[in-house]
Regions:
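Short, amphipathic, aromatic/basic-enriched membrane-interface segments that mark the entry/exit
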Residues: 86-96
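Short active-site segment of divalent metal-dependent hydrolases/proteases
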Residues: 99
């Protein structure tokens, strides 16, 4: 599909940018809410609080690694601009690793705060990302790449990384 000599491709900064901004804004507001209003839902057992904090740090660190591998390892900008479907490397483990990395980073930030109420937000983030991807990028990718993308999405998880099938 060509337009005036230029290839039609996904924007480098697409709907995901709005998702990421909303994600960080929600996480920041939730953090403020913990400080002012949600102290009653804090994890009070020291050993359990430690588990939350350690898990949060690990999840956030893995998210940063996932983002770095997704962006720099897969040369994502170059592939988008050249209208190439990326299916190797980390993209063999997860279809949307950049968005997943931001989701996991924010989940890690929420876990570190060790507050029971905040545990609902990663599920909300996952649901929002699923709906957003199904209604935008994945529709476009199916139209653009046809059966190649249909085969790819049948083998690779949308958000949760999993070894290739």
């Amino acid at each position: 599909m060509e337009t005036r000599g230029e290839r039609v491709h996904l924007p480098v900064f697409g709907v995901g940018t709005a998702y990421v901004v909303a994600l960080f804004t929600t996480t920041a507001l939730a953090s403020v809410a913990v400080f002012f209003w949600l102290g009653w839902a804090a994890v009070n057992l020291n050993w359990l609080r430690l588990i939350f904090v350690v898990a949060g740090v690990i999840v956030a660190a893995l998210a940063v690694v996932m983002w770095l591998v997704s962006v720099f390892g897969a040369r994502v900008t170059e592939n988008i601009e050249n209208n190439q479907l990326i299916t190797g490397g980390i993209y063999a483990w997860v279809r949307h690793p950049i968005y997943a990395a931001f989701l996991f980073l924010n989940a890690g930030i929420l876990l570190v705060q060790a507050n029971y109420v905040l545990l609902i937000l990663p599920a909300v983030y996952w649901l929002a990302l699923t709906v957003l991807m199904k209604r935008t990028e994945e529709r476009w990718l199916r139209r653009q790449f046809g059966q190649q993308y249909v085969d790819y999405e049948s083998c690779v998880n949308r958000i949760m990384p999993w070894p290739p099938r």
